[in-house]
Amino acid sequence: MKKYIFGIFVIFLLSGCSFLPQSLNFYKPSYSQNATEERLRSASRKWQKTPYVLGGTSRRGADCSGFTQTLMREFGILLPRTTKTQMASGIKVSKAKLKAGDLVFFKTGRGPNGLHVGIYLSRNEFVHLSTKGGSKIVNLNNAYWKSRYIGARRYMK
């Protein structure tokens, strides 16, 4: 009788396992990295003629952190307002592990904190709002940016 009860218990136990989902990846983004990159590129094109205005957050005029804050809001991500606070939150990411949507930070010596922020796209490219005006896509390996890079933060899962 004990073997019979044990056998039924094992059958129920094993049958319960068959109902587990194939993947337990709860943090899978709702769109791929390529789609994220394309959406970022498309959204940033709307900012190509935006003048650089310290404290601004719209396409009528914005600074670098206003640009990242407003652009990332299109992805449902609410960023802190300033470059300094954007750099202090999120998840720290190494340069080798950058993904589309990660924020990249630089010590430029300009502005109240001397910091600058952009959004990583792919293949070492990032988009930022230039102090000369308008969104620009540039390479992290450019001598100017490479020497000023200070870190990255991830806000997208």
Tell where the protein language model's regions lie, with residue ranges.
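N-terminal capping segment at the start of a domain
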Residues: S42-L54
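Aromatic- and glycine-rich peptidoglycan recognition patches
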Residues: F19-E37, S42, I77, K92-V93, ...
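Catalytic cysteine-centered active-site loop
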Residues: Y27, Y31, P51-A100
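Positively charged n-region of N-terminal signal peptides that target proteins for export
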Residues: M1-Y4
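Structural motif
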Residues: G101-D102, N124
